[in-house]
């Protein structure tokens, strides 16, 4: 499983400009250098045609150049005074094995209420796995079915965006409870430092219908392109078995490239949601535009920014 924009790792949603952004910056530097050389050459030519008295008079009359005003620096999130949490609990009974891992980043550990929430989730999942494993040992312990008695679970949270008020997190988990293969999935939440409470990413928007109306067409177009690329084809994708899933079936994550507000939205279709298990998951990044901000709840609009 690819760790969770957006799964368990901090997602870099990328940029719509891609490599062109760097190219534009390079062209700007070349133009600036050329402009500077032309100004220098012009100054030398003027100096050569002027007398020393004229040069001194012009220099004395020239007003001092005002220093260009610098834009204010964006606010910074609170400093982190905590350590990343990495918890494991493994056991073995003969050839039967049980493995469990759960972790969250230092930014989450620094918020007591959030750390308590994640700790409770970890303890609940561990207790469930232990009970399931013990039951499997009793039922299949004397059989040759190793897959029937092996259990594996991992869930890792990571930072998607860390803004002064909001900490956006994603998670990815993998679970094996017997059979041919395990299963993976993703999810996320946003922690509101002012309210000291969790907010579901969907909770920032006015309604599921509004999200579908605005994000749905962009998601389906990007998904079709991603499926064609993954399957190595150029023609249309057969959607008879796996039609484009609605936004309601996806993981929604809020990200920030500019660090001043949520300016991009990550959409993840877990395995089986938009394609076969072999296809894996699909991730799409939607830059925040004016029509997206229009469907954000009034109390959260200030937390969003247009993508640049």
Language-model region placement:
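C-terminal motif of bacterial Sec signal peptides marking the signal peptidase cleavage site
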Residues: 46-48
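Extended hydrophobic/Leu-rich segments
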Residues: 14, 33, 37, 85-87, ...
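Compositionally biased intrinsically disordered regions enriched in Thr/Gly
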Residues: 50-308
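Bacterial N-terminal signal peptides that target proteins for export
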Residues: 18-39
């Amino acid at each position: 499983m690819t760790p969770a924009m957006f799964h368990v790792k901090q997602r870099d949603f990328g940029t719509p400009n891609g490599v062109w952004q760097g190219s534009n910056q390079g062209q700007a530097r070349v133009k600036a250098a050329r402009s500077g050389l032309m100004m220098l050459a012009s100054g030398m030519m003027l100096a050569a045609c002027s007398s020393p008295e004229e040069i001194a008079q012009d220099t004395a009359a020239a007003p001092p150049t005002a220093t260009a005003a610098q834009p204010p620096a964006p606010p910074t999130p609170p400093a982190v005074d905590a350590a990343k949490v990495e918890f494991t609990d493994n056991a073995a009974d003969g050839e039967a094995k049980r493995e469990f891992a759960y972790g969250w980043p230092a930014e989450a550990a620094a918020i007591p209420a959030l750390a308590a929430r994640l700790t409770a989730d970890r303890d609940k999942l561990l207790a469930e796995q232990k009970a399931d494993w013990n039951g499997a040992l009793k039922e299949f312990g004397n059989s040759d079915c190793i897959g029937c008695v092996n259990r594996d679970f991992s869930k890792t949270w990571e930072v998607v965006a860390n803004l002064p008020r909001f900490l956006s997190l994603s998670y990815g988990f993998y679970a094996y409870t017997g059979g041919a293969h395990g299963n993976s999935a993703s999810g996320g939440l946003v922690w509101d430092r002012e309210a000291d409470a969790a907010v579901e990413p969907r909770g920032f928007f006015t309604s599921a219908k509004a999200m579908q109306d605005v994000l749905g067409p962009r998601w389906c177009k990007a998904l079709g392109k991603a499926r064609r690329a993954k399957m190595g084809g150029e023609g249309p994708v057969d959607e008879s078995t796996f039609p484009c899933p609605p936004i309601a079936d996806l993981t929604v994550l809020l990200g920030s490239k500019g660090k001043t507000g949520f300016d991009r939205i990550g959409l993840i279709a877990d395995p089986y949601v938009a394609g076969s298990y072999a296809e894996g998951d699909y991730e799409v990044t939607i830059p925040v535009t004016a029509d997206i901000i229009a469907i954000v709840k009034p109390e959260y609009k200030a937390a969003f920014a247009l993508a640049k």
